[in-house]
Curated annotation (Swiss-Prot):
Complexes and interactors: Monomer.
Enzyme Commission identifier(s): 2.5.1.19
Protein name listed in UniProt: 3-phosphoshikimate 1-carboxyvinyltransferase
Keyword Signal: no
Record-listed 3-phosphoshikimate binding positions: K22, S23, R27, S170, S171, Q172, S198, D314, N337, K341
Keyword Cytoplasm: yes
InterPro entries in the record: Enolpyruvate_Tfrase_dom, Enolpyruvate_Tfrase_sf, EPSP_synthase, EPSP_synthase_CS, RNA3'P_cycl/enolpyr_Trfase_a/b
Residues of the signal peptide: none
Family matches, as PANTHER family: AROM/DEHYDROQUINATE SYNTHASE, PENTAFUNCTIONAL AROM POLYPEPTIDE
Length: 428
């Protein structure tokens, strides 16, 4: 197993241009495919998850070109659903942002499609989405366990109608439904049951759908109405914002490390909800400065907070490790959906924080962290989860440093993360 030892770092300083957002990249690729016209995506994320989406689209006959650095993609839209008389098997790794939207989109046209993934993907629920698609007339069957991939779709189109979906588990299910609804044969009304998690991710979806010319009536995130007869039309060019979740590690480093870190590519005007991570850091005592397309974090004495993190579920993980450098206890609540991500992030985070000496209380949907007087060096298991690896890089600010097991798992969203981190760090 590969390991990376991060030696103690006293402070950080510098500027980081954040790679494109994973959430926006994969949504935009799918909408560009369904749209009429040619779309150029600029600042596309080059990572495993995006590669899985691109490979699937290529297999399905979608034509696109990539720049040498794979951050600019020009794609010729199909002007509607994918229509084929062939059977396809598509391997989607552990990319939820490819599995869920593709599962929905492939029901719109014709063909037989089998969607598979890594073993962890077979543990990530998709049943709520499949149930909703079946309400609209989709023919989908599970190949192993009910409610989980792999699955096979026999596509004949979606009829339209009223559909209910549980919003309390993952916003990706609602995102997938919203993106396909305009291309159903009839009008679609989506009623959301339960409290909608990760609401800002729905804002990303609605923003992109509007850019591609589709109208959605949003009734307070509890009911969405999508008229029939709509079509996606390419806006020509889509600029992908920097990934706000990826920005969180560098902002936390600035807050902990006593220097100044500026992240560019994401700022006050960002559509991503995870930019509000900077507000959580400010609540801990960090000095935060906002620009339209940048955020600056400066070091300060941090203190624990008690906060509902439902609105920033991915970036909230970074608060868990930043809490090791804060005075007092930090409690984060309303984060049950950590449990159905790349790994059970609540259990994994609790386990690894205890290794470095923290006192941790893990609940059904919360975590409470009391930092040790002095963290101890530990080998951190990353569970093939990119965010675990990046979060625990912050332990480099402890006198003991840290060892990250399987650091290459950051390839899911940020392949050169540790190089970027090292460029900011000033060793002791």
């Amino acid at each position: 197993m590969d390991q990376l030892r991060l030696e103690p770092v006293s402070r950080v300083n510098g500027v980081v241009n954040i790679p494109g957002s994973k959430s926006i990249s994969n949504r935009a690729l799918l909408l560009a495919t369904l749209a009429s016209g040619e779309t150029t995506l600029v600042n596309l994320l080059d990572s495993d998850d995006i590669r899985h989406m691109l490979n699937a689209l290529k297999s399905l006959g979608v034509n696109f070109t990539l720049s040498d650095d794979k951050t600019v993609c020009t794609l010729n839209g199909l002007g509607g659903p994918i229509q084929t008389d062939k059977a396809f098997e598509l391997f989607l790794g552990n990319a939820g942002t490819a599995m869920r939207p593709l599962c929905a989109a492939l029901t719109l046209g014709t063909g037989e499609f089998t969607l598979t993934g890594e073993p962890r993907m077979e543990e990530r629920p998709i049943g709520d989405l499949v149930d909703a698609l079946r309400q609209l007339g989709a023919d989908i069957r599970y190949l192993k366990n009910d409610g989980f991939p792999p699955l096979t779709i026999n596509a004949t189109g979606l009829a339209g109608g009223v559909v209910e979906i549980d919003g309390s588990l993952s916003s990706q299910f609602l995102t997938a439904l919203l993106m396909v609804a305009p291309l159903a044969k009839g009008a679609v009304t989506i009623a959301v049951k339960g409290e909608l998690v990760s609401k800002p991710y729905i804002d990303i979806t609605l923003d992109l759908m509007a850019k591609f010319g589709v109208t959605v009536v949003n009734d307070n995130y509890q009911r969405f109405e999508i008229a029939s007869g709509q079509h996606y039309v390419s806006p020509g060019k889509v600029l992908v914002e920097g990934d706000a979740s990826s920005a969180s590690y560098f902002l936390a480093a600035g807050a902990i490390g006593g220097g100044e870190v500026k992240v560019t590519g994401v700022g006050r005007l960002a559509v991503q909800g995870d930019v509000k991570f900077a507000d959580a850091l400010a609540a801990m005592g960090a000095d935060i400065e906002w620009g339209e397309d940048y955020i600056i974090a400066r070091g300060s004495k941090l203190h624990g907070i008690d906060m509902d993190m439902n609105h920033i579920p991915d970036a909230a993980m970074t608060i868990a490790t930043a809490a090791l450098f804060a005075e007092g206890t930090t409690r984060m609540s309303n984060i049950y959906n950590w449990r159905i991500k790349e790994t059970d992030r609540l259990a994994a985070m609790a386990t690894e924080l205890r290794k470095v000496g923290a006192k941790v209380e893990e609940g059904h949907d919360y975590i409470q962290i009391t930092p040790p007087v002095k963290p101890v060096h530990a080998e951190i298991d990353t569970y093939n989860d990119h965010r675990m690896a990046m979060c625990f890089s912050l332990l480099a600010f402890a006198d003991c440093g840290v060892t990250i097991n399987d650091p290459g798992c950051t390839s899911k969203t940020f392949p050169d993360y540790f190089n970027r981190f090292a460029n900011l760090a000033k060793p002791d």
